[in-house]
């Protein structure tokens, strides 16, 4: 049984909901707290976490009268205690404290801790059967098979919190899984949508960071420019909705108004539209199975004027093709894909490789991993973290030769 509820079969939520926000001071956390701030009568904050932003975490914990606050950096425990002195708010520091925050009793958890560090806290929330709004890609890209199984076993409810998968989640409610023929994930095309391949190869960091529609962090903006981010979303959709690679299509939609579509057997296509504002999918998750009053601007289609669509160019954006290759390879290949991309993006930011070499490093790492016969199923979070670590080391080893070829 899927942990993602494809039909709204739950009764409407009643009473005050206890919520936990993992990654409260990041961009997703900020949007979540903005929505909580607007409806204080509906929610009580149980726990908040942050990576290292003690001041921001303490401010939020006091504002929302949280019962527990945790900072991932263990060395900052003294700072957090000082910031919360006299408030009565419990606090902790280190990985264990973040996991404790996730394990504390609450009805709803926003899992927005970035990177592989978010996997164990998300699992702690899943294991107690919580409703989890999932914004951490690594849970699915690096560990999707066992993560979704754990969620199903614990009868946890997984709500997709990013815009594309939340759009699919909403559209899928229009039919049964057996009636689905395909899902369509939209992509803006990024800043290089109309660029020639030779120009993309030589693109600078400043150019890669000029996203036409979304305001995001550095890593995800670079991933959008390479379309690696869309590749990661294809992998996430595979695990969230139990889809084969052939059932997942990517369409370039420069306006970023339609975020996802679902085609059913009668050839009806159901789409979800909204302004490019992360508060929209988060509000859907926060209110589910009800709807709450949103904070994003209303959509005015007359001002947009037109919605256009293009096929993605796999030759100019090979990162997207590689995601499908990794899915078809199976098991831990998607973990390797993600790890190699993280190493490649970091190298690009440091000007060690050209933009075009990002996908080449990912491809070489994937191929080397598969040739070595290292594909194996992942049975635990530690397995996923181990593969992630080894794949990063492999990508780092291959980096000099990729850089040399481009010079």
Curated annotation (Swiss-Prot):
Q: Where does NADPH bind?
A: 25-28, 53, 136, 138, 217
Name the gene behind this protein.
Answer: dxr
Task: Set out the biological process GO terms recorded for this chain's protein.
Answer: isopentenyl diphosphate biosynthetic process, methylerythritol 4-phosphate pathway involved in terpenoid biosynthetic process
Annotated residues for binding of 1-deoxy-D-xylulose 5-phosphate = 137, 163-164, 188, 211, 224, 229-230, 233
Write down the superkingdom of origin.
Bacteria
Enzymatic reactions: 2-C-methyl-D-erythritol 4-phosphate + NADP(+) = 1-deoxy-D-xylulose 5-phosphate + NADPH + H(+)
| Summary of the function given for this chain in its UniProt record | Catalyzes the NADPH-dependent rearrangement and reduction of 1-deoxy-D-xylulose-5-phosphate (DXP) to 2-C-methyl-D-erythritol 4-phosphate (MEP).
The protein's annotated pathway: Isoprenoid biosynthesis; isopentenyl diphosphate biosynthesis via DXP pathway; isopentenyl diphosphate from 1-deoxy-D-xylulose 5-phosphate: step 1/6
Q: What is this protein called?
A: 1-deoxy-D-xylulose 5-phosphate reductoisomerase
Organism of origin: Rhodopseudomonas palustris (strain BisA53)
What EC number(s) does this enzyme carry?
A: 1.1.1.267
GO molecular function: any one? Answer: 1-deoxy-D-xylulose-5-phosphate reductoisomerase activity
> What residue intervals traverse the membrane?
none
Q: Which cofactor does it need?
A: Mg(2+); Mn(2+)
EC category: oxidoreductase
Q: Which residues bind Mn(2+)?
A: 162, 164, 233
Q: Which UniProt keywords apply?
A: Isoprene biosynthesis, Manganese, Metal-binding, NADP, Oxidoreductase
Stated family:
Belongs to the DXR family.
Which SUPFAM superfamilies did the record assign? 1-deoxy-D-xylulose-5-phosphate reductoisomerase, C-terminal domain, Glyceraldehyde-3-phosphate dehydrogenase-like, C-terminal domain, NAD(P)-binding Rossmann-fold domains
């Amino acid at each position: 049984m899927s942990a993602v509820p494809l039909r709204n079969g739950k009764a409407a939520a009643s009473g005050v909901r206890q919520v936990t926000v993992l990654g409260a001071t990041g961009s997703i956390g900020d949007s979540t707290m903005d929505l909580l701030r607007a409806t204080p009568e509906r929610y009580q904050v149980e726990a908040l976490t942050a990576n290292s932003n003690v001041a921001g975490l303490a401010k939020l914990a006091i504002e929302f009268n949280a019962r527990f606050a945790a900072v991932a950096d263990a060395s900052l425990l003294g700072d957090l205690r000082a910031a919360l002195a006299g408030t009565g708010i419990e606090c902790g520091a280190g990985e264990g404290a973040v996991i404790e925050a996730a394990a504390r009793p609450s009805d709803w958890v926003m899992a927005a801790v970035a990177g592989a560090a978010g996997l164990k806290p998300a699992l702690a929330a899943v294991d107690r059967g919580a409703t989890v709004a999932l914004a951490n890609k690594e849970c699915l890209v690096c560990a999707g098979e066992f993560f979704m199984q754990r969620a199903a076993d614990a009868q946890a409810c997984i709500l997709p919190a990013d815009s594309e998968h939340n759009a699919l989640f909403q559209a899928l409610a229009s039919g049964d899984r057996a009636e689905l023929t395909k899902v369509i994930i939209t992509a803006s095309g990024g800043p290089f949508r109309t660029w020639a391949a030779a120009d993309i190869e030589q693109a600078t960091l400043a150019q890669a960071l000029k996203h036409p529609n979304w305001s995001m962090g550095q890593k995800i903006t670079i991933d959008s420019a390479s379309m690696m981010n869309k590749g990661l979303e294809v992998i996430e959709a595979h695990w969230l909705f139990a889809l084969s690679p052939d059932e997942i299509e990517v369409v370039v939609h420069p306006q970023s108004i339609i975020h996802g579509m679902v085609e059913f057997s009668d050839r009806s296509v159901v789409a979800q539209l909204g302004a490019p504002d992360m508060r929209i999918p988060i509000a859907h998750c926060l209110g589910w199975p009800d709807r709450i009053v949103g904070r994003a601007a209303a959509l005015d289609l007359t001002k947009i004027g037109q919605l256009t669509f293009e096929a993605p160019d796999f030759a100019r954006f090979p990162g997207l093709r590689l995601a499908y290759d990794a899915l078809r390879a199976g098991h831990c290949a998607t973990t390797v894909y993600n790890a190699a991309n993280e190493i490649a993006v970091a190298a690009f930011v440091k000007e060690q490789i050209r933009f075009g070499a990002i996908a080449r490093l990912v491809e070489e790492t994937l191929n080397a991993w598969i040739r070595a016969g290292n594909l194996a199923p992942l049975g635990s979070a530690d397995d996923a973290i181990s593969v992630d670590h080894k794949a990063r080391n492999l990508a780092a080893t291959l980096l000099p030769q990729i850089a040399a070829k481009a010079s």
